[in-house]
Amino acid sequence: MFNKLALIGIGLIGSSIARATRLKGLAKTIAISTRKAATLDEARALGLGDSYTLDAAEAVRGADLVILCTPIGAYLPVMEAIRDALEPGAILSDVGSVKGQVMASLGPLVPKGVHFIPGHPIAGTEHSGPASGFPELFTGRWCVLTPAKGTDPVAVDRLDRKSVV
């Protein structure tokens, strides 16, 4: 079990991760951050998390698992906002479909001691937004993890064994 899961972005994939995490009891608490107040209010109304904030750095403080669930184009500004708040030993992952670009742009920004394990759940629907998620979205689906060479195998195993996707 993770102590704190921080989800940055709460659309279809992020909200499905939140729901699956709750259903499977994979994290003690879920922190949610998004850039739009209306989306955050919707996530709160749906009860998707335990804490809600427009400040991504606030969401990741104390998190042992952080998953970027924003569009890939937002990764760099999000990473710049959260990098100093990431805890040593935390796992940082994502749900984007492109890995080379993500690893090249974010990898150098990941603080020492943080385990960067990009992921790609092979799942989705034509719907979007917090209300569109459902915990079974990942059932029977692959999630490809793409850790960089030298990534701590214990961290990879922890994410793989505890994965909600």
PLM features per residue range, with description:
Residues M1-R61:
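NAD(P)+-binding Rossmann beta1-loop-alpha1 motif at the extreme N-terminus of oxidoreductases
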Residues R22, D41-R44, R83, G107, ...:
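Class I S-adenosyl-L-methionine
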Residues A27, G49, G89, G113-H115:
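A generic structural signal for alpha->beta connector loops
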Residues S33, D94-V95, G119, T146:
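Generic beta-sheet signal
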Residues A57-L68, I72-V110:
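Rossmann-fold NAD(P) dinucleotide-binding segment
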Residues P108-S163:
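Rossmann-fold dinucleotide-binding core
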